[in-house]
Amino acid sequence: TEEAMLDKVCSEFSKVIVVINANNPMELDWVDNYDSIGAVILAPGTGQTGMAALGEIINGSVNPSGKTVDTYVKDLTQTPYYNNIGAFAYNNVDDLKEAIAASDTAYEGTVSFVDYVEGIYVGYKYYETASDDGVINYEDVVKYPFGYGLSYTTFEQKMNDFSDNGDNVTFNVTVTNTGDVAG
């Protein structure tokens, strides 16, 4: 299993980089179970040449600059999706049941549906809103938030030319790379 592989690799090496090659967010709290995991690289949908660049990121010759485009949680069983999904049965579709039974020998007699209720509170929008509303403790639920990502360099930000005329607020931000590598 993947867990057995991680156990073996992390018991043999003190510096481990985990590469997640998956297009969908997943539960990632397990990362904290291994002291030797020093980095997690998200490499979804790499296409024809993406994996070739991965080695350059791992060896430090290319600075990773991507950010997460969704939220990665600690426990999927606590997500709205997990708790709203199910096989709910219709009880007013007798004609449909008969038609299905006549054409499908594997039919077991239930016409089910999914009660999808997240609405606008899907993905990172749910976690940000639920945290602001006091429904969840963000740090207890979210492992890697929307927009998370590290770099091999450091930056300094400075706000300049702040102006508030009552109707509009304007300002400029100067971002300076203060590290030794491009970012």
Labelled PLM ranges:
Residues 1-35:
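Hydrophobic helix-and-loop "lid/oligomerization" segment in the mid-to-C-terminal part
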Residues 21, 26-182:
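Secreted, periplasmic, or luminal enzymes acting at the cell surface/secretory milieu
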